[in-house]
Design a protein with these regions (language model features):
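Short coil/turn segments at alpha/beta junctions that flank glycine-rich nucleotide-binding fingerprints
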Residues: 106, 122-127
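Generic structural signal for helix capping and beta-alpha/helix-loop junctions
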Residues: 41, 138, 159-161
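Hydrophobic packing within well-folded, soluble alpha/beta domains
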Residues: 9, 20, 95, 113-116, ...
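Conserved acetyl-CoA-binding loop-helix of GNAT-fold acetyltransferases
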Residues: 97-99, 105-119, 138-146
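Short, contiguous, well-ordered secondary-structure segments
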Residues: 84-86, 117-118, 135, 161
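GNAT-family acyltransferases
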Residues: 1-102, 123, 164-194
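Conserved catalytic-core motifs of GNAT/GCN5-like acyltransferases
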Residues: 130-132, 150-167
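Conserved hydrophobic/aromatic "anchor" residues
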Residues: 12, 119-121, 149
Length: 194
């Protein structure tokens, strides 16, 4: 479990099934993250997914997709989720987030992402994490920047994702503070690393 000033970032538990279903069915989440779990997942399927998350965590294999709860320390409410996976095409570790609409714009996602990135990189000896997002998602761009990710480049690929065709996306990186590579890639140009 990761603790921040206002949050816990932890594995989902079976008692969080309703909260995870709420995240999965939130219209704001679905706009950019329709592939969270399976597209046609039903409420009764959620506990099985949570057990799979636990099994993946227990396996220690960091190359497999994972999903963590973002919990409000004060209220115990699950407000969103962080996802982590080894991006198949890029062969890099990718972090993602999704917040229930009522909790957006309050800095929770950036607080969770920053803490998770530092904790995970340090714990696994990973130099950096990436975030990949549609250029039409300005809220996620702000979250990435607030949590220490820097725009590395804008890439083009013709892909059907997020329920629509997307040809441009932003590619961000956040280096672990202990990484010797950090200074090599974080320059002063608008596209860091170029």
């Amino acid at each position: 479990m990761i603790e921040t000033k206002r949050l816990y970032v932890r594995l989902f538990r079976e008692e969080d099934a309703e909260a995870l279903y709420k995240i999965k069915t939130d219209p704001q989440v679905m706009e950019y993250c329709p592939d969270l779990l399976d597209v046609k997942v039903e409420r009764e399927d959620i506990p099985r997914y949570i057990r799979e998350f636990q099994a993946l965590e227990d396996s220690g294999d960091i190359d497999e997709w994972r999903c963590y709860a973002i919990e409000n320390k004060e209220t115990g409410e699950i407000m969103g989720a962080l996802t982590f996976s080894k991006q198949k095409m890029l062969h890099e570790y990718e972090l993602g987030w999704m917040m229930i609409g009522a909790y957006t714009g309050k800095g929770y996602a950036s607080e969770a992402a920053e803490a998770f990135a530092e904790y995970f990189c340090e714990g696994h000896g990973i130099d950096y994490l990436i975030v990949v997002m549609d250029v039409d998602n300005p809220a996620s761009r702000r979250t990435a920047e607030k949590s220490g990710f820097r725009l590395f480049e804008k890439r083009t690929v013709y892909d059907y994702s997020y329920n629509r065709y997307c040809d441009d996306y932003f590619y961000f990186r956040r280096y672990w503070t202990g990484s010797i590579l950090k200074d090599r890639y974080y320059g002063d140009s608008p596209y860091y690393g170029r």
